[in-house]
Amino acid sequence: MAKKVVGEIKLQIAATKANPSPPVGPALGQQGVNIMEFCKAFNERTKDMAGFNIPVVITVYADKSFTFITKQPPATDLIKKAAGISKGADNPLKNKVGKLTKAQVLEIVDKKIADMNTKDREQAAKIIMGSARSMGVEIVD
């Protein structure tokens, strides 16, 4: 028989930087999860994704055990890294803060497509390009 699920927690945590302080500690503590066990497992699983915030979905069971799924970093983080910028434009219609090539967009799509709501590479590229434009990043050929 399957374990009874008592909760699901969604967080964004910096890769390899999970620790018992807020927001991780309080969110897991309310469900009775062993916080240090989660932190060690998360940090181990994300050691090759350093520098990104990683979305994680933690499923908590009635016996206080847990499983978690890490997803790819948010598209905005991938765009900022590829464009070499620290933040998006304050007025993206007037100010352009960086440039991305179509090849860089497709590279981001290949990393991100598993977490997107489309499996079509061209549609996923349009979504990423729209996110880039809304950040003030110009798409060039």
Curated annotation (Swiss-Prot):
* The entry's keywords: Methylation, Ribonucleoprotein, Ribosomal protein, RNA-binding, rRNA-binding
PTM: One or more lysine residues are methylated.
Is the Metal-binding keyword given for this protein? no
Q: Quote the Gene3D superfamilies the UniProt record gives.
A: Ribosomal protein L11, C-terminal domain, Ribosomal protein L11/L12, N-terminal domain
A GO CC annotation given for this chain = cytosolic large ribosomal subunit
Source organism superkingdom: Bacteria
Known InterPro entries for this protein? Ribosomal_uL11 (IPR000911), Ribosomal_uL11_bac-typ (IPR006519), Ribosomal_uL11_C (IPR020783), Ribosomal_uL11_C_sf (IPR036769), Ribosomal_uL11_CS (IPR020785), Ribosomal_uL11_N (IPR020784), Ribosomal_uL11_N_sf (IPR036796)
Q: Does the keyword Metal-binding apply?
A: no
Q: List the disulfide bonds.
A: none
PROSITE patterns (UniProt xref): RIBOSOMAL_L11
Q: Which Pfam families match?
A: Ribosomal_L11, Ribosomal_L11_N
GO terms, biological process: translation
Among the GO molecular function terms of this UniProt record, one is: structural constituent of ribosome
> What does the UniProt record say this protein does?
Forms part of the ribosomal stalk which helps the ribosome interact with GTP-bound translation factors.
What is stated as this protein's family in its record? Answer: Belongs to the universal ribosomal protein uL11 family.
The subunit field of the Swiss-Prot or TrEMBL record says: Part of the ribosomal stalk of the 50S ribosomal subunit. Interacts with L10 and the large rRNA to form the base of the stalk. L10 forms an elongated spine to which L12 dimers bind in a sequential fashion forming a multimeric L10(L12)X complex.
Protein name (Swiss-Prot/TrEMBL): Large ribosomal subunit protein uL11
Record gene name: rplK
